[in-house]
Amino acid sequence: VAVCDIIDERAKDAAKEFGVEAYTDYTEMIGKADMDVIHVVTPDFAHRDPVVKSLQSGRHVLVEKPMATTLEDAKAIAEAAKMADGKLMVNFSNRWNVPHHNTKKAIDNGDLGQLKHAYARLSNTTYVPTQMLSWASKSSPTMFLLPHMVDLVRWFFSAEADTVYAVKTEGVLKSMGVDTHDTMTALVTFDNGAVACFETSWILPESLPYVVDHYVKIIGSKGITYADLAERGLRKFGEKAEYPHRTDTIYGYGRGFPYDSIYHFLECIIEDKEPINNEMDGLMNTAILCAMLDSAEKGEPVKVEI
């Protein structure tokens, strides 16, 4: 129906591609366009206003992770969602990633026994903060990548985080003109007695054959799961080595977990059921991320609070 971008040329190009109306002011789009669903894909720090106003207009809203980068913004969105007629889903798309989905099934089936420990790593090469994201200085590997890992571990554990101790390193990205930290390592205790170690980095070398390094290990009293998602997929060798993108269209339809999460949201609207992940998942996710940043600044453990 409509697309909105603050850059007029981008809005018009997208509108032409999809045959829809173009706007540069989302409030104007909300007021004029005849639509049921709004997908908010603004930079991470700019989610609050478009999400809240979209919900207040009665539309269903899908917002990209993280739901917000501050607790204040996350609480405002969560409150708006509770008051709204429409549904809100935070796009924690890795719940639809097959290895992670199968991990959750194994846990729920009791194959791993009582959960004890998780190790979750998600990192990027320097391409992401230096070339892909124009707003990287207003974000960090913690806020851009760890929302996925934190959500997965909360989902696996069916528990809430209690205490966080985190350590960051910095210097490499700042020397490249990107004002944010390089790496973050966080130890998080949960109220079910389990412990999780989270690791993220934005300074992996671009010589790596993949942009995303992604690994998750879950240890239980009866078993263990490993999910290494960095090396899976097609590798093609000719004059140069190529690692084609893992998600694509097949016979005209989008396939893979980034599409499947969106399909789920649309299904929830059509069938009037609640999304698997909602505003409370988004709020708790942001609370844990903010606790990591707070702990890294203070150099001491902090409680996860909302």
Residue ranges and their predicted role:
Residues 24, 63, 88-90, 119, ...:
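Hydrophobic residues in well-ordered beta-strands that form the structural core
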